[in-house]
C-alpha cells in the first residue's frame, strides 16, 4: 500500500499538473470552455496510452540494454533530482509561451507536457524496479493521471483560488518533495550497488 502511495506521489510530481496549468490555459485560451474540456480529456487519454505503452515495454528495453536494478535506481534518482531543481528554479524559457489559433493535437499537450521524456524514462525505471508488482504500478499511474486530469479540467478555478503566484509556490513545494524522493531512490541504488 505504501508503494502505491509513494509511486502515485512521484508520478503526480513528475506530471506536474500545477506547473502545466498556465501553459494549458495559454494554448487553449482561444477555445470555448466546452471545447477546451474535450481537448484536455482527449490529450490526456493520448498521454495515458503513451505512458501505459512505456510502462509495459520499458522492462524489455532495459533487458535489451542489459541494465541492472542498481543502475536504474541511481540514474532514476539523478533524473528526478534534475527535474525537481527545474521545478524549484524555473527558467524563463521553461514557460514555453506557445500560442496558436489552431487546436492542438498530440503535441505539445499530450507529449511532451504530460507524457514528457522524464516521465516516460521514470515509467521504464519503475517497470524494471517493480517487475512483479505491475498491478500496483498501473494503479498508481491511473490515480496520478486522474488527479492530473481533475486539476487541468479545473484550471480556471485553481488560478482564481491561488493566483499565478500561489500556483508557482505550490509547484516549488512539489519540487522540494520530489528532491527528497529522488535522493531516497539514489541512496537505495548506491546501497544495493555496495551490497552486490
From Swiss-Prot:
Transmembrane regions: 8-28, 45-65, 71-91, 105-125, 134-154, 174-194
Membrane topology per record: Multi-pass membrane protein
Coiled-coil stretches: none
Alphabetical keyword list: Cell membrane, Membrane, Transmembrane, Transmembrane helix
InterPro entries listed in its UniProt record: Multi_antbiot-R_MarC
GO cellular component: plasma membrane
Signal peptide: none
One Pfam family hit: MarC
Keyword Membrane: yes
Subcellular location, principal: membrane
Compartment list: Cell membrane
Name listed for the protein in its UniProt record: UPF0056 membrane protein BU449
Organism field: Buchnera aphidicola subsp. Acyrthosiphon pisum (strain APS)
Origin organism lineage: Bacteria, Pseudomonadati, Pseudomonadota, Gammaproteobacteria, Enterobacterales
Amino acid at each position: 500500500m505504501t508503494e502505491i502511495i509513494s509511486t502515485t506521489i512521484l508520478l503526480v510530481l513528475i506530471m506536474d499538473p500545477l506547473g502545466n496549468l498556465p501553459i494549458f490555459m495559454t494554448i487553449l485560451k482561444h477555445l470555448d470552455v466546452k471545447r477546451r474540456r474535450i481537448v484536455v480529456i482527449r490529450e490526456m487519454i493520448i498521454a495515458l496510452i503513451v505512458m501505459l505503452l512505456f510502462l509495459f515495454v520499458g522492462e524489455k528495453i532495459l533487458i535489451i540494454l542489459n541494465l541492472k536494478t542498481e543502475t536504474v535506481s541511481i540514474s532514476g534518482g539523478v533524473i528526478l533530482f534534475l527535474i525537481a531543481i527545474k521545478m524549484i528554479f524555473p527558467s524563463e524559457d521553461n514557460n514555453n509561451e506557445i500560442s496558436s489559433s489552431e487546436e492542438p493535437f498530440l503535441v505539445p499537450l499530450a507529449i511532451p507536457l504530460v507524457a514528457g521524456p522524464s516521465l516516460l524514462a521514470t515509467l521504464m525505471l519503475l517497470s524494471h524496479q517493480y517487475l512483479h508488482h505491475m498491478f500496483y504500478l498501473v494503479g498508481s499511474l491511473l490515480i496520478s493521471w486522474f488527479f492530473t486530469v481533475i486539476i487541468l479540467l479545473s484550471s480556471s478555478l485553481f488560478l482564481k483560488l491561488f493566483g499565478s503566484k500561489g500556483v508557482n509556490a505550490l509547484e516549488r513545494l512539489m519540487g522540494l518533495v520530489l528532491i527528497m524522493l529522488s535522493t531516497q531512490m539514489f541512496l537505495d541504488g548506491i546501497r544495493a550497488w555496495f551490497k552486490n
